[in-house]
């Protein structure tokens, strides 16, 4: 949720054409698919569903697979500069993990969906770490990531960037906070939701964007986003 929103807002403030995909929806199915900040309309979604249905032929798809392929179909036709994809459940076997990301982010590892992901943080962390890719950045947004996440990152060859080791955040007076890493820092307006967890998510979003290949995002876009 919020990490995707931070990445999307900052990239759009930098002038990038951005698509975002989250799940599940709260009120309307249109919510999970955003094209340049605007929810996909009904006609676009219907066209995407029809395209996926035709392409799958006799191959069965789950609800989330169908929705993910539809979002990717729309993104490909719009011609984006950045696609931000949120994993729906776990990571290793999630439909979104079909895509090879330039940067992956794991914010926190909580004990939920235990019937599917495992009984504790170590087991769940191993599932979430499945989104890591060799030689690509893996941003870890909590200080005490499970050892299973770190083991998988190292075994995969991913470049783990860890909160509390590689980047930091701290509150400041006057409604601001500081993000920093070795050799760089930003002083930014406090997020609307100013809890430490939200600052950690915002800090992770900054690291993810700075780790992307290509043109750097200007500092002012981080403040505007």
Each predicted region: which residue ranges?
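Short alpha-helix boundary/capping motifs
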Residues: 1, 65, 142-144
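Hydrophobic positions on the alpha1 helix immediately C-terminal to the Walker A/P-loop
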Residues: 2-7
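Short, well-ordered alpha-helices that flank and scaffold nucleotide-derived cofactor binding pockets
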Residues: 8-13, 73, 77, 151, ...
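ATP-dependent carboxylate-amine ligase catalytic core
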Residues: 13-99, 115-117, 123
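A short glycine/serine-rich beta->alpha loop
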Residues: 56-61, 190-196
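Acidic, Mg2+-coordinating active-site environments of NTP-dependent enzymes
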Residues: 81-86, 101-192, 200-223
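A generic local secondary-structure boundary/capping motif
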Residues: 93-96, 128, 196
């Amino acid at each position: 949720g919020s990490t995707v929103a931070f990445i999307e807002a900052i990239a759009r403030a930098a002038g990038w054409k951005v698509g975002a995909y989250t799940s599940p929806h709260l009120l309307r199915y249109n919510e999970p698919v955003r094209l340049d900040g605007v929810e996909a309309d009904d006609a676009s979604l219907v066209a995407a569903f029809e395209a996926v249905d035709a392409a799958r032929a006799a191959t069965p798809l789950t609800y989330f697979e169908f929705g993910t392929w539809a979002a990717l179909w729309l993104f490909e036709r719009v011609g984006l500069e950045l696609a931000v994809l949120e994993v729906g459940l776990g990571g290793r076997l999630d439909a979104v993990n079909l895509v090879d990301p330039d940067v992956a982010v794991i914010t926190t590892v909580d004990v939920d969906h235990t019937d599917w992901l495992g009984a504790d943080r170590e087991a769940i962390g191993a599932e979430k770490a499945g989104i890591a890719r060799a030689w690509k950045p893996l941003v870890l947004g909590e200080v005490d990531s499970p050892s299973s996440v770190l083991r998988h990152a190292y075994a995969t060859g991913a470049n783990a960037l860890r909160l509390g080791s590689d980047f930091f955040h701290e509150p400041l007076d006057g409604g601001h906070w500081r993000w920093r890493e070795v050799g760089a820092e930003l002083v930014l307006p406090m997020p609307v939701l100013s809890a430490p967890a939200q600052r950690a998510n915002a800090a992770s979003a900054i690291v993810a964007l700075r780790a992307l290949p290509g043109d750097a995002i200007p500092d002012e876009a981080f403040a505007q986003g």
